[in-house]
Amino acid sequence: MSFDLRTRLDARRAEHLYRQRPLLQSPQGPQVVVDGQPLLAFCNNDYMGLANHPEVIAAWQAGAERWGVGGGASHLVIGHSTPHHELEEALAELTGRPRALLFSNGYMANLGAVTALVGQGDTVLEDRLNHASLLDAGLLSGARFSRYLHNDVTSLASHLEKSVGDTLVVTDGVFSMDGDIADLPALAQAAKAKGAWLMVDDAHGFGPLGANGAGIVEHFGLSMEDVPVLVGTLGKSFGTSGAFVAGSEELIETLIQFARPYIYTTSQPPALACATLKSLQLLRTEHWRREHLASLIQQFRQGAEQIGLQLMDSFTPIQPILIGDAGRALRLSQLLRERGLLVTAIRPPTVPAGSARLRVTLSAAHSKADVQLLLEALEQCYPLLDASESTEPVHA
């Protein structure tokens, strides 16, 4: 009996859900070249505009000269270098916590944290719109796993009443496909009332949120007691790559001992840590980046509402335009691309059926003129959806 892979692939195509990889032929930034076509991009997560910053590049180059280009071993063997340690200390300072621990990527950080903290006989409660890495972590932990209604503390409280063993409540800080933020004060209160821990993956909050860019916990003025487990990624606002978990001394030591995705993998290149240290410095000192980004978000929302687009409840750089049908979302993405703009159509299973959307993401590297070009193109293209049949573009 053979694997019938062709049938699975054909079904994806028929449902307008087939994915292909655009080939980026330039550095990240607002102006990119994709598959040979110059485009103005509104689809990366480089919120602070640091991915191609000359000082960050120079820090990476200097780090490679000093430390080489490979981690060489796992952290627990001989792969934990001085730049890694300095970056962990800087991230602990940013988050106001005693310790931080580096991971190679956000998926591994989430998987490592959840599976190290709970297992058989315990409970994991997750927002139903959490990132796939969090949902996978909950399922793989072996703990009793269930999802509460999106951002609904009443639903969470009902699940908490039925929890057993150690209970971990897990939520995104900023929800990556909707752009809305978790009601952390209410979630923290509900968790603490039942002796549960709250874990927040703030991948999209670090940078845009908080007075110093320290994310949603800083935005709400919460403490480590409110959010014992805080996860962040470095490949978005920091402009580099990797992830971290920040928390108490006991939490970090527990992860070092029990988080398998941390233990059984080679450390990231030390030069990458050098680059991230520089981007962290820029993030903390160049406050104009957050201010400029906030003004772009306001400009886009005002313009989109005037056009009559259906936006979602978001004041973050993630500004989804709800379309509904996957084919229509693909068509609008294609129409924009024909006008030199790159905005990705997001379809099931990434989002629920019937909620396909264009996911606009804004960056401090964008200009007001860039956003105006996008708004003008949307005003021209959106009415055309009803005038033509859905067709699948080359890349979506």
Swiss-Prot record:
Pyridoxal 5'-phosphate binds at residues 106-107, 176, 204, 233. Pathway: Cofactor biosynthesis; biotin biosynthesis. It catalyses: 6-carboxyhexanoyl-[ACP] + L-alanine + H(+) = (8S)-8-amino-7-oxononanoate + holo-[ACP] + CO2. Substrate binds at residues 19, 131, 350. Keywords: Biotin biosynthesis, Pyridoxal phosphate, Transferase. Coiled coil: none annotated. Its EC number is 2.3.1.47. GO terms for molecular function: 8-amino-7-oxononanoate synthase activity; pyridoxal phosphate binding. Transmembrane segments: none annotated. InterPro entries: Aminotrans_II_pyridoxalP_BS, Aminotransferase_I/II_large, AON_synthase_class-II, AONS_Archaea/Proteobacteria, AONS_Proteobacteria, PyrdxlP-dep_Trfase, PyrdxlP-dep_Trfase_major, PyrdxlP-dep_Trfase_small. GO terms for biological process: biotin biosynthetic process. Its cofactor is pyridoxal 5'-phosphate. HAMAP family: BioF_aminotrans_2. Belongs to the class-II pyridoxal-phosphate-dependent aminotransferase family. BioF subfamily. Catalyzes the decarboxylative condensation of pimeloyl-[acyl-carrier protein] and L-alanine to produce 8-amino-7-oxononanoate (AON), [acyl-carrier protein], and carbon dioxide. Homodimer. This is 8-amino-7-oxononanoate synthase. It comes from Pseudomonas savastanoi pv. phaseolicola (strain 1448A / Race 6) (Pseudomonas syringae pv. phaseolicola (strain 1448A / Race 6)). The lineage of its organism: Bacteria, Pseudomonadati, Pseudomonadota, Gammaproteobacteria, Pseudomonadales. The gene is bioF.
